[in-house]
UniProtKB/Swiss-Prot annotation:
It comes from Rhodopseudomonas palustris (strain ATCC BAA-98 / CGA009). Residues 335-550 are annotated as: B. Belongs to the heat shock protein 90 family. Its main location: cytoplasm. This is Chaperone protein HtpG. GO terms for cellular component: cytoplasm.
Length: 628
């Protein structure tokens, strides 16, 4: 050891930790039971790590006894001690693990915790469970010995601005042969956690399926095990109740909601493995982090290996659970995980099983499936873009809001298609309200044609894949030409059509607009989409849809392909362009107005807002609209 290593030292908390501790210390939350669940979960993780590291280094298990977790209540003074004989921590690990939070999303957690009283769910989601102990303790002492080390360190904090790290006393070092001892000096109003029955109640509710024995060491009476310590996923489905699965989900996922779907089965044959997966009923906070990492835990013969094995494709990353293999080697390295053919086979098989389970749920319990889709549909739709092999199945699972005002499957959409309708129409945008008022819907609405309204960011990407469903291609209403000639308008719209019909020289009007706008648009066309609006912007028939064009243009800071301006020849503004009384300056103003109002309706600002305002003022003052 160096001089610094042997000396007692006081260190400040990382800023986020200090803020988090302030919330915990002054907490008014009612779900304080969770502190014990979180500490037991951490102890279980430490035992898992020891078991894994001891595969390569058996000597790590020589001191400290069989893996277990002990809970020791003690009155006068009121302390609750949680002890594990797991991997333990050295000095730097104590500083890193208890003095800082490296996990992304911490600031988001703190802001959410300050806003809500659902501390239980948030603490479980964000993985900052150790600090929950400050809800019940005004001081915490952690003594730890790293497996295989002679050095023992003590970390102490009263939840203020910092903590003290020092070599452990001889007495404390003698108590901790291996692993970690956490002593909570309880607040006066937390003394109930010294009652044996309270401890048993919490362990039974939250931690019964922890794989290691949890021993209660009462002040009076003999120590006793208070959890079942069984790997629930290895048990038969017939032995388990719905409550068993709910408890297992909460323990495995660190969650407080109930699972929306449970998949439990055992595969036998060329490979043997057990699978227990859950779909949450609420969105995890990190669902859309750029890494798109899954949270499935890989075990080999009940030995925890990793939760970073990419056991499912990214579009199923919302699932939580366990896969326990009988055949994989225990010494899997990170590199081997990426290349192991057995693991790849497990991934393929389990992914297929998950899709089948979702199909079954959609068929037999549509309301339950809709809840999953509402929470995780944007993630599942990533598979439409990435998983060509399962695209058809994922399309069948997809549920879409439509102009009919309800969530529908593509099968339901196709069954309701109009006579002579050969395509499935959709429109992509960033807001349902804006889409519903989009002028590109007008001609379809006039014919009673249903249109899918897509508002998730991923929609602009997966729809670019030239997809079809049941032989019916998906067609964007903001790309290429549309032809509704074989589908008659509804009666009221036919009457309106006859009244609004106007005679305009198409070629003349288009030439005037092109001359005014120049290269600001790629083309000007008469529209088959519009019935009441004057203009709209669309993309060409080849390449990206209009919404994807806009996304790509923003990503390239303005560089992108030019849109096509479509005009409604029956609209008075357009008719005014063909009027011989309209001079060239007025015609240019009108042409720009057609472009700029189309941009606004498309969710964009005009290129020059000041010029747009001046132009609009001029037209209003001149009363040009009256020319129509």
């Amino acid at each position: 050891m160096t001089m610094t290593d042997t000396a007692s030292e006081t260190k400040p908390f990382q800023a986020e930790v200090a803020e988090l501790l302030n919330l915990m210390v002054h907490s008014v939350y009612s779900e304080t039971d969770i502190f014990l669940r979180e500490l037991i979960s951490n102890a279980s993780d430490a035992l898992d790590k020891l078991r894994y590291e001891s595969i390569a280094k058996p000597e790590l298990m020589e001191k400290g006894g069989e893996p277990k977790i002990r809970i020791i209540p003690k009155k006068a003074p009121d302390t609750l001690t949680i002890v594990d004989n797991g991997i333990g921590m050295d000095r730097q690990e104590l500083i890193d693990n208890l003095g800082t939070i490296a996990k992304s999303g911490t600031k988001s957690f703190i802001s959410k915790l300050a806003e809500t009283k659902d501390s239980a769910g948030l603490i479980g989601q964000f993985g900052v469970g150790f600090y929950a102990a400050f809800m019940v303790a005004d001081k915490i002492t952690v003594t730890s010995r790293r497996a295989g080390s002679d050095d023992v360190w003590t970390w102490t904090s009263a939840g203020g601005a910092g903590f003290e790290i020092a070599p452990a006393s001889e007495e404390a070092a003698a108590r901790v042969e291996r692993g970690t001892e956490i002593v909570l000096h309880l607040k006066p109003d937390a003394s109930k956690y010294l009652e044996d029955w309270q401890i048993e109640r919490i362990v039974t509710e939250y931690s019964d399926n922890i794989q290691f024995p949890i021993l209660l060491m009462p002040e009076e009476g003999e120590p006793r095990q208070i959890n079942s310590a069984s790997a629930l996923w290895q048990r038969s489905k017939s032995e388990l109740s719905e409550d068993d699965y709910k408890q297992a989900y909460k323990q495995i996922a660190g969650a407080f909601d109930d699972p929306a779907m449970t998949l439990h089965y055992r595969a036998e044959g060329r490979q043997s493995y057990a699978v227990l997966l859950f779909a949450p009923s609420t969105k995890p906070f990190d669902l859309f982090e750029p890494e798109r990492k899954g949270k499935i835990k890989l075990y080999v013969r009940r030995v925890f290996i990793t939760s970073e094995a990419e056991l499912l494709p990214p579009y199923l990353r919302f699932l939580r659970g366990v896969i326990d293999s009988e055949d994989l080697p225990l010494n899997l390295s990170r590199e081997m995980l990426q290349k192991n053919p057995q693991l790849a086979q497990i991934r393929t098989a389990v992914t297929g099983k998950v899709i089948s389970e979702l199909e079954s749920l959609a068929d037999k319990k549509p309301e339950d499936f809709t809840k999953i889709w509402d929470a995780f549909g944007p993630v599942l739709k990533e598979g439409l873009y990435e998983d060509f092999e399962r695209r058809e199945k994922l399309l069948s699972l997809a549920r879409f809001t439509t102009t009919a005002g309800e969530k529908r499957s593509l099968k339901q959409y196709v069954e309701a298609m109009k006579e002579n309708q050969t395509e499935i129409y959709y429109l992509v945008g960033d807001s349902l309200e804006r889409l519903k008022s989009n002028p590109k819907l007008e001609s379809a609405t006039a014919r009673g044609i249903e249109v899918l309204l897509l508002t998730d960011p991923v929609d602009a990407f997966w729809t670019s894949g030239q997809l079809d469903f049941g032989g019916k291609p998906l067609k964007s209403l903001s790309q290429g030409d549309v032809n509704f000639d074989l589908i008659p308008k509804l009666e009221q719209d036919q009457d309106k059509d006859n009244k609004d019909e106007a005679k305009v020289d198409e070629a003349t009007v288009i030439a005037v607009i092109k001359d005014a706008l120049g290269e600001r648009v790629s083309d000007v066309k008469a529209s088959q989409r519009l019935t009441s609006s004057a203009s709209c912007l669309v993309a060409g028939g080849m390449g990206p849809d209009r919404e994807l064009e806009k996304l790509l243009a923003r990503a390239n800071k303005g560089a992108g392909s030019k849109p096509i301006l479509e005009i409604n020849l029956q609209h008075p503004l357009v008719a005014a362009l063909g009027d011989t009384k309209t001079d060239k300056a007025e015609a240019a103003d009108l042409a720009f107005l057609l472009l700029e109002q189309a941009q606004i309706l498309d969710g964009e600002l005009p290129e020059d807002p000041a010029a747009f305002a001046s132009r609009l003022n001029r037209l209003v003052l001149r009363g040009v609209v009256a020319h129509g």
